[in-house]
């Protein structure tokens, strides 16, 4: 489907806009599942000031969504009304070192942040090497893996509010918990400051190699997937609950529960977003029936049905 083109009405109010603004832009190529409809508006800001300028002048009735590299995301088949913001590496992907602190733009890949830290002999960020996506997305959901999470290393984060205002958050003020941030969802994170601990680079690299080896042997990283689908319930492993409910290999249309890791859904080639979401809900129902436990989605689902 196509949405009404809003650009002719918006552009006159934004004469100094420097980023790229598109109407009815395909989102499927921007997600790891490779499914979903278009964005009514897709804006790629030139930098933080450009993002603030755009948001301040965007009519308040137009909803705003943020999309990173699409690694933990289902965009529904009807697409996404309103404005979708996508932070690009140019303008938001820088990483730099200051002592035992890593400064990173929100579009920097988690893996790159870990590599930057390792090269500088900064330990404690190895867990990021195994997390797909960008540091902005990791910050939003307090991402974690292999015994570490963002909350452990975060010093400060910067973001832009829906009205274009600048916000700076310290760790405690973000109220980070398991796969959750307490910061208002309308804030778009633009940069982060992470603190590690000085350590021998070879020790850090060895830990990162272990993380990568585990991913390659235990996760379907070469499939069209969104990463871990459901949060682990307290004291439980989501994959084990899914397996025990008989869902390993379960299919709906072109979507399948991974045979390798049950907490991963994959697009076998011709899945729709509806196939993937329906499969996820089927898994949730079967797990609830089998164990009485209600799994919570970890993957973000946005947009409207076709």
Curated annotation (Swiss-Prot):
Catalysed reaction, written as an equation: UDP-N-acetyl-alpha-D-muramate + NADP(+) = UDP-N-acetyl-3-O-(1-carboxyvinyl)-alpha-D-glucosamine + NADPH + H(+)
Keywords, ordered alphabetically: Cell cycle, Cell division, Cell shape, Cell wall biogenesis/degradation, Cytoplasm, FAD, Flavoprotein, NADP, Oxidoreductase, Peptidoglycan synthesis
Compartment(s): Cytoplasm
Keyword Cell wall biogenesis/degradation: yes
Short name of any one Pfam family annotated for the protein: MurB_C
Domain (FAD-binding PCMH-type): residue spans on this chain: 34-199
Pathway: Cell wall biogenesis; peptidoglycan biosynthesis
GO CC terms in record: cytosol
Listed EC numbers: 1.3.1.98
GO molecular function: FAD binding; UDP-N-acetylmuramate dehydrogenase activity
An individual GO BP term: regulation of cell shape
Gene3D superfamilies given in the database record: 3.30.465.10, UDP-N-acetylenolpyruvoylglucosamine reductase, C-terminal domain, Uridine Diphospho-n-acetylenolpyruvylglucosamine Reductase, domain 2
Catalytic machinery residues: 179, 228 (proton donor), 298
Cofactor list: FAD
Top-level EC class as recorded in UniProt: oxidoreductase
Cell cycle as UniProt keyword: yes
PANTHER family associated with the record: UDP-N-ACETYLENOLPYRUVOYLGLUCOSAMINE REDUCTASE (PTHR21071:SF4)
Family: Belongs to the MurB family.
Function: Cell wall formation.
Protein name as catalogued: UDP-N-acetylenolpyruvoylglucosamine reductase
Species assigned in the record: Rhodopseudomonas palustris (strain BisA53)
Gene name, Swiss-Prot/TrEMBL: murB
């Amino acid at each position: 489907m196509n949405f009404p083109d809003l650009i002719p009405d918006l552009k006159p109010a934004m004469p100094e806009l420097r980023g790229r603004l598109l109407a009815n832009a395909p989102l499927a190529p921007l997600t790891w599942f490779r499914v979903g409809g278009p964005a009514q508006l897709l804006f790629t800001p030139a930098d933080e000031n450009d993002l603030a300028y755009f948001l301040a002048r965007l009519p308040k009735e137009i909803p705003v969504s943020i999309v990173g590299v699409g690694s933990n995301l289902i965009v529904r088949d009807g697409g996404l009304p309103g404005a979708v913001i996508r932070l690009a590496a140019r303008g938001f992907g820088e990483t730099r070192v200051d002592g035992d602190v890593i400064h990173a733009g929100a579009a920097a890949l988690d893996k790159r942040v870990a590599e930057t830290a390792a090269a500088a002999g900064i330990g404690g960020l190895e867990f990021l090497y195994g997390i797909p996506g960008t540091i902005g997305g990791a910050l939003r959901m307090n991402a974690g893996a292999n015994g570490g999470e963002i909350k452990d290393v975060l010093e400060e984060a910067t973001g832009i509010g829906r009205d274009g205002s600048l916000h700076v958050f310290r760790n405690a003020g973000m109220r980070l918990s398991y796969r959750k941030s307490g910061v208002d969802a309308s804030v778009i994170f633009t940069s982060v400051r992470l603190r590690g601990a000085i350590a021998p680079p070879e020790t850090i690299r060895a830990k990162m190699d272990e993380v990568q080896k585990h991913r390659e042997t235990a996760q379907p990283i070469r499939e069209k997937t969104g990463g871990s689908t459901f949060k682990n319930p307290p004291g439980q492993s989501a994959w084990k609950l899914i397996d025990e409910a008989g869902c390993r290999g379960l299919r709906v249309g072109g979507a399948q529960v991974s045979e390798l890791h049950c907490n991963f859904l994959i697009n076998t080639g011709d899945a729709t977003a509806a196939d993937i979401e329906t499969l996820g809900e089927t898994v949730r129902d079967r797990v609830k029936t089998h164990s009485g436990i209600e799994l919570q989605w970890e993957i973000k689902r946005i947009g409207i049905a076709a």
